[in-house]
Amino acid sequence: MPSLSKEAALVHEALVARGLETPLRPPVNELDNETRKRLIAGHMTEIMQLLNLDLSDDSLMETPQRIAKMYVDEIFSGLDYANFPKITVIENKMNVDEMVTVRDITLTSTCEHHFVTIDGKATVAYIPKDTVIGLSKINRIVQFFAQRPQVQERLTQQILTALQTLLGTNNVAVSIDAVHYCVKARGVRDATSATTTTSLGGLFKSSQNTRQEFLRAVRHHN
């Protein structure tokens, strides 16, 4: 793996140790992003031609390049730990020992089974120990792991593990409520169902009162 920030390396190692890392094959020859985009565009051209689409049409001729750029620079950018957000943690000088909750974190991800959209919101909470984290960093961590081919259960646990690792405490909880377009737009075509996943650590798992306080925050969001 290329040179990474200390925080990115720690999070990656923690996910591997827990068996929660996104399935990735070892790179045989590390490609730069421009090469990736060029090769993806070539394969996308072949796919579109197999669908009998006319790539000489001005509406379609740039589509392979647009998709390649979207994959590498946007919706799958979380596969590259070089894009892991810069994390700021500060000493807990105020001795905060109550739950800190961030609700309504918007996320858009991609189902790894069909490569269609997952659209949802996350609620994240933690009880500080020695450090506290800049609130926007929680949103950025959620977004980083969402920018991958995902299953919602793994995404929830990846966010939990990342925050536990960075904050040095197990007292973290994550809940995600999302609509899966592999259910909404194909297959059963259920336009109204949503999926909720929750991952609890430390006191959020062992203390009924703490768990209920978090779940009330989740219900408030819903």
Swiss-Prot record:
Single Gene Ontology BP annotation: one-carbon metabolic process
Pfam families xref list: GTP_cyclohydroI
Cystines in this chain: none
Pathway this chain belongs to: Cofactor biosynthesis; 7,8-dihydroneopterin triphosphate biosynthesis; 7,8-dihydroneopterin triphosphate from GTP: step 1/1
Organism superkingdom: Bacteria
Keyword 4Fe-4S: no
EC number: 3.5.4.16
Catalytic reaction annotation: GTP + H2O = 7,8-dihydroneopterin 3'-triphosphate + formate + H(+)
Record keyword Hydrolase present: yes
Example of a GO MF term: GTP cyclohydrolase I activity
The protein, known as: GTP cyclohydrolase 1
Native organism: Enterobacter sp. (strain 638)
Name of encoding gene: folE
